[in-house]
Amino acid sequence: MKKIVVGLAVMLGFCTCVHQPSGTLDVNKALDYCAEQTQRTLAELKTDSGIDYTMMPRNIMTDEHHWNCRKATKEEWCAGFWPGVLWYDYEYTKDKQIQKEAEKFTNSLEFLSKTPAFDHDLGFLVFCSYGNGYRLTKNPAYKQVILDTADTLATLFNPIVGTILSWPREVEPRNWPHNTIMDNMINLEMLFWAAKNGGNPYLYDIAVSHADKTMKCQFRPDYTSYHVAVYDTITGNLIKGVTHQGYADSTMWARGQAWAIYGYTVVYRETKDPKYLDFAQKVTDVYLERLPEDKVPYWDFSAPGIPDAPRDASAAAVVASALLELSTYLPNGTGKRYKDAAIEMLASLNSDSYRSGKSKPSFLLHSVGHWPAHSEIDASITVSYTHLRAHETPEHL
């Protein structure tokens, strides 16, 4: 049985609003719970006529108890997370029926490899689904879908600016000539993978260029991030940094900073350039310094109503996953500090304060995707994926 020990000091540091976790984080127990919730979701998706494999669980609002599902389309950025959940669950349980379900849901996204890019979310859509599928099965058809989709994502790269255009649909309505959102850092992983697995080597250059320009322009002097960077397409210069899903242009949106932490950890992994390792630590440290005691952030670090403002479990899960990896690249002292922080985060997320339990078929409660738009609030498939990935991370470092 796989257990991670949580020190006494960690336990004592937890705030009273969170159920006190035990002295160990039992990863198998956590994954067993996720497997049970995955089965509940599958049961909920079944109808008298079977399962519609193009309909993906997306979110469960605070006053609801069942998944809201969305059709897998090029516009639906969350559609790759549920297949990814199934692949991770199969990896743990070795349940062949789960593998079959993962294959069927994954196959419903194949069209994305043959469709012009709608926006930057192709990495979320395809690498979470086909990427995990290929990792576990080595199905050559999956590999080709990833390679083709990486080429599609590359069409959004603007060499004058040096980054990928995130939201073509917002160019005219918001007068954002070339916009790049922090979420885009996650999609670089697919480009790196494709470049070293038979794809165009230029994909590597795109990923590095995007990481460099984002590092230069999308962070404040204190290493907190802007959600959106708006660039001039003629000069390539930054026009402004703004928010879209955070509280204000000047604040640190929790999930955006989480994307940055994970993204630059990946960029270091793929390049081994020490400047990215240094930067990953800087964006991590400002995040850790401002966390509440239970290590689960408020949805924005300057949100109104703190300490009663909503938390974002999805950001915590993303950061926990990143720090478990980042800790392996650093000397014992620093690495241990990051690993311990990740364990504290996972201990909180596995407590009764954050688990959905029997109330909902999701893994966790208290996520915030887009508070200003009241979207993806409370339980989301995004956090189900990132939470499961965080627990699986030690298995493939």
Predicted features and spans:
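Extended ligand-binding clefts on enzyme/binding-domain cores
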Residues: 181-300, 314, 337-351
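Bacterial Sec-dependent signal peptides at the C-terminal "C-region" and cleavage site
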Residues: 12-23
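Extended ligand-binding groove/face enriched in aromatic
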Residues: 92, 96-186, 190, 194, ...
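Conserved small/polar residues in nucleotide/adenosyl-binding loops
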Residues: 386-395
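Well-ordered alpha-helical scaffold segments within catalytic/enzyme domains
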Residues: 80-95, 111-112, 125-139, 188-201, ...
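Carbohydrate-binding/catalytic loop surfaces
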Residues: 50-73, 124-137, 164-183, 223-252, ...
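Extended, well-ordered alpha-helical scaffold segments
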Residues: 23-37, 94-110, 139-155, 199-217, ...
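Low-complexity, Ser/Thr/Pro/Gly-enriched N-terminal "stalk/linker" regions
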Residues: 21-80, 88, 92, 96-97, ...
